């Protein structure tokens, strides 16, 4: 199976935008929630990202892209099986709100290129340190790029990274109808 996937992957058209590029755009959109609100979503600014996602879904060819009164984004990637066979529908779900505890406004992204190991000090607030002791997974990321905020805001990776992955997957599926 992995050989077939690898061979097929070589013929795939790339998405219009990488997941990382999408993520870097999405984290700059403030979607901070509010604990003291009963409304869903708890802040109107969450619609800013929701409406952008609907626009992008339409541009990449997803059908019936829309946002509900509750800020939930829906879209359909049409089936492409020749025999119109009935197959299970799959939903991909991610939230877009960020923590009310830390600001999500004016996010400044820092990309730590080719991480060399050790603790990561956030540049605008040196008291904010991601330590190897508390985050031992850093040991596995040596040589990779690590994305953080500058220490003055929340990055919003939970779960804008998930949204970026879902949007990139939809883009890839729409550009590659040979995928079944």
Model features per residue range: what roles?
Residues 28-32, 55-63, 171-179:
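Generic secondary-structure signature for well-ordered alpha-helical cores
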Residues 12, 16-19, 42-46, 50, ...:
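Generic structural signal for well-ordered, non-membrane alpha-helical segments
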Residues 16-44, 148:
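N-terminal capping segment at the start of a domain
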Residues 38-87, 91-93, 97:
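A non-catalytic alpha/beta surface segment that caps or lines the substrate-entry region
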Residues 20, 24, 51-54, 163-171:
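Predominant activation on well-ordered alpha-helical scaffold segments within soluble catalytic domains
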Residues 84-179:
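Active-site metal-coordination/substrate-binding segment of hydrolases
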Residues 7-11:
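Boundary at the C-terminal end of the N-terminal hydrophobic targeting segment
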Residues 1-4:
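Bacterial N-terminal signal peptides
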